[in-house]
Amino acid sequence: MFPVVEGRPMREQLRFLHLNTVQLSKLLQENVPSYEKEPGFEQFKVSERSHGNWIRLYLEENNSEVLFNLGARVRRQYLDALRTLRLSLSKRAAQYDVYSMAAGTVLVLEVLALLLLSVPQALGSRAELDVPLLSPVCSLLFYLLLLALAALHVAVCTAADSSCYLCSLPWLAAGGVMALTAALLCAVVSTLTRTFAGGKCLSQNPPQSTSRWSELDLLSFLGTVGHVLSLGASSFIEEEHQTWYFLINTLCLALCHQIYRNCFLGDDCAPQRCPHMGEEFDGVTVALQGKRAGPEGWELSRAPTDPSSLEALRGPERWMVLASPWLVLACCRLLRSLNQTGVQWAHRPDLGHWLTSSDHKSELSVLAALSLTMIFVLVQKRCSLTSKVAMAFGLLGIYCYRAAIGNVLFPWQQDNKDISKGITEARFVYVFVLGILFTGTKDLLKSQIVAADFTARTVGLWEIHSGLVLLAALLLRPHNLPVLVLSLAIQTIMTQFIWRPLRHNVTEVTVMHYWFGQAFFYFQGNSNSIATVDISAGFVGLDAYMEIPAVFLTAFATYSGPVLWASHLVNFLTSKASSGSALSRACFCYALICSTPVSVYIVLVTSLRYHLFIWSVFSPKLLYEGMHLLITAAVCIFFTAMDQTNTKS
């Protein structure tokens, strides 16, 4: 506040500070019965008396240095009083359930610690995640921790001013929370002990070869850590889309450098790895350096045994590989101009506002028709004939729905006087969405029964992906259809000309899918503010408000970018019959890179609960992170269901 009034005369400065201090003191009197004993109120009274002395000197027309020094001291007293009053009011007005918050934070950190300690095992040659829960539960440490937590719970809940959420739960539920906390802590200790024991064996038998980080490994690690650290500043949260735009642009430049180096300088210094060729998974990139001997070994990177597939490319294919990162960069730059989001530049007009204005409805109609056509072209290539027909009719129904509600026009339509809710048209599309999803699910069940039927599995997964694309096209606004088209186009470019020729490992491919999914979340026009949620998506095809369908449709429309990129990741990793343990690794990597920022952010929000922007910036972001975590859990369940490594073995 002081920089605002700094250039004013001393009399006006003190007057402004006095008015603000009076307002805060009145709020303190309304909220605190014994406000006279508060330090802030006492400082306010001292400041008022000093202010009165300064006014007497000022009225005596004393312009000496004494008047200036006294004014500076009064100003400092007012600022101290304002700071103390603000802190007292924040603590009084915001009563937090610290006990429940601490219990939840401990649970989250325990899960994160288990994930981090399981990196060598989960990304090793067998790709197995073994969390030791049974043996720690039978240990003495578990019962000692459970007894200590129960004593703490009784002490907190029997306090005079206790109003905690955990205390309101039945004893059975609260006991379950305490038992889970103790079991996870024992599992962390057990995993840590096993890791240190393995480290001693590793030091006695050092590896013969040294492992090193590739450029993409460093970029993935530094980008993830940098994003996590940026969540501690409110400005970075408000403009988080800029962080993701920067990361994917840097990723495209790193891929461009890798492609040019492999094409023109050879692959002597560039290890090539294939994420979906069974034996080559032994060299998966992990977040820790080192190499363990034996079948459970893991290493950072591995030198290639086969020649690079880039050497076999000739003519147009080779040039497409060279140009693919620049095509992706151009698509991302175009998408940034479509929707302005965040806070700093949200007021600036963008292409989306221009398209949605009533004067440009014809242009929007042409763009929507072209986008729906391109969606069909990009998706139908791997679908069955029945799904292709259903996709075509579904996309036609989407255009009819948008025309019925007045968003677009038919070529023979001059105006949109006959506007309706489009319920019939939307339900017509829902029929085809459910039909495509049912066909894909049927093929997946068939592949589970007949283990050798690999084609049915890949077709079923792609048809489920196609059904989700059709649902997203229905729920997204017409001006956002190009976002969906460019998302599918980038997936095709990356698959054909980057991931397969460069043979990236599972970790790198998973991180890229996650980053692009986050970027497309913001390309849709979303932000970390609740105001950008498109509530209308929850009412598509509904006569009245229905809670469960509305919540599902709104959540899917909001997070369609991350969901579609995760679905494409499953399809990409299962596109080869010898996919091995790719899905297990991808599931672990996806869970780790999503849970890390959430866990750190929960700790930050807990520590910054009295921050000035806690309700306007940090709390909405926490809601977004919670919803994103639920979607990630659903994605990981889908990954686990699709993983047939154990059944094949």
Regions found by a protein language model. Name each.
Residues 1-90:
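Soluble extramembrane regions of membrane proteins in the secretory/endomembrane system
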Residues 96-649:
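Alpha-helical transmembrane segments of integral membrane proteins
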